[in-house]
Amino acid sequence: MNKIFFTADLHFGHTNILKHQPNRPFAQEGDYILGDLTFFKSEDARHLLEKLPGQKFLVQGNHDGSIRAYSNYFKTTSQILDLTVKPTACPFLSENLMLTLFHYPMLTWNHKPYGSIMLHGHCHGKLDEHNRLSNDLPFDVGSDGELAKKAGGLVPLELIYETAMEKTGGVSFHQYAKNNYRSEVR
C-alpha cells in the first residue's frame, strides 16, 4: 500500500519560517502540496524542486508565482483538484473516499452533498477550531495546523480518514452528507 500524504504552507525561503516553524516537514514521495511551497525567486525555486524526491502534486497557493514556471517538476499542477481514493489503494477505507483539494478553505465544494472531504491550507491553523465545530468535513493540512502537529509533519490520509470518521460518529461519509445536506433526498 502506498501512503498518501498532504501538506501546505511550507514557505521554503521565507526569512521567518524557521523562527515560527523550526521543525516543519519536508515533502516525501507522492505528496500532495496544497500551495505556498516556496517564497524563493525563480532560480532558487528550481534548485529546491530539483532536490525534492518522488512525485509531487501541486495545488497552487497565493505564494507559488515563481513555481509556475517549473510545472515539469510536478506530476500535476492545478488550482483545485478532486480525488477519489479507492479501498484497493488504501485498505483502511471501507468505501471510496472523495477529496477536494484547494489552497484556500471553502464553504462549499464539489461533491460536498455526497460526502466529499475538503482539504486546504492557507490559514496556518487559525480555522482548526472552526473546522472541528462545523458540520462540514473541511480539514487544514497546513504545516502549522493541528493535524500536522498531531502527525508530526506531513498529514497522512489515514489520519484525515480517522478524524473525519470521529466527526461523523462512524457513519459513512455519503450517509453523513445525506443526513446533513440532502434531507430532501431521504
Identify what each model region corresponds to.
Residues 17-19, 58-61:
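Short catalytic/metal-binding and nucleic-acid-binding patches
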Residues 57, 72-184:
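Conserved beta-sheet core of the metallophosphoesterase superfamily
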Residues 35-52, 60, 65-81, 111-112, ...:
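Metal-dependent catalytic neighborhoods of phosphoester/phosphodiester hydrolases
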Residues 1-44, 141, 163-164, 185-186:
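N-terminal active-site segment of His-dependent metallophosphoesterases
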Residues 22-24, 47-52, 118, 134-139:
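Glycine-rich, phosphate-binding/catalytic loops in enzymes
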Residues 2, 48, 95-97:
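Short acidic/polar mixed-charge low-complexity motifs
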Residues 9, 36, 61, 121-122:
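Active-site glycine-centered loops adjacent to acidic/histidine catalytic or metal-binding residues
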Residues 12, 39, 64, 106, ...:
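Short, glycine/acidic-enriched loop or turn micro-motifs at the edges of active sites
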